[in-house]
Amino acid sequence: MKIYFDNCSLQRPLDSKIQVRIAVEAEAVLGVLSLCESGQIELISSEALAFEISRSLSPDRVTWALEVLSRARVYVQVNDQIESRARLLVERGINPLDALHLASAEEARADYFCTCDDQLLRRGRSMTDLNTKVISPIELVGEVGQ
């Protein structure tokens, strides 16, 4: 099983846990990452993720994300095909960086694209032609636990 975490889901364990939803999502991400470490799940990284992470103003968040992604077995370099697919996704209402993430996940044949972004979840789920399932961290735990 291959999983692509977007930056917001990858960073969720570092967010303030004041809200129950955030705390539960953080634990879900950590649980799935532990399955990645044990080799039960294949983690995907990408040039788009590396770019987005590099823009963070928090050195702790950069260190955390790069450490997690160093365990990825697959690294997706942006190419013409990914850029073309991302442009189509942008035309359908996905923001440009999210579109690059989704196109990268499709290129890597990710089973799941995990995000905490409600708008991206809604839009991604409404697209019947995506080659990856857009899912929240909480839903992902349910899927990998089966």
Ranges and model annotations:
Residues 9, 49, 82, 100-101, ...:
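Alpha-helix capping/helix-boundary segments
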